[in-house]
Amino acid sequence: MAHKKGASSTRNGRDSNAQRLGVKRFGGQVVGAGEIIVRQRGTHFHPGVNVGRGGDDTLFALSAGSVEFGVKGGRKVVNIVVPA
């Protein structure tokens, strides 16, 4: 039985596409309602005031305002500060 599989046969050659995760809008930036703030796997950042969380844990703005990152109860949270 051959211990090599023969010519032009390989088990390599796979490379997945990047997932384009990360922070898309940084602290102090102004966003509109529905804009994506963070794309993530799991809840590295938790949604705060005026921020929603999608089924794939994406954080998005629920209302227009400026982005604010902070900590609450030991968790990193993202808030949207609405101008008065």
Curated annotation (Swiss-Prot):
Keywords: Ribonucleoprotein, Ribosomal protein. The keyword Ribonucleoprotein applies. Residues 7-19 have a biased composition (Polar residues). GO terms for molecular function: structural constituent of ribosome. Gene3D superfamilies: 2.40.50.100. PROSITE patterns: RIBOSOMAL_L27. It holds the Pfam family Ribosomal_L27. InterPro entries: Ribosomal_bL27, Ribosomal_bL27_CS. GO terms for biological process: translation. It comes from the Bacteria. GO terms for cellular component: cytosolic large ribosomal subunit. The keyword Hydrolase does not apply. Residues 1-21 are annotated as: Disordered. Belongs to the bacterial ribosomal protein bL27 family. HAMAP family: Ribosomal_bL27 (MF_00539). This is Large ribosomal subunit protein bL27. The lineage of its organism: Bacteria, Bacillati, Actinomycetota, Actinomycetes, Micrococcales. The gene is rpmA.
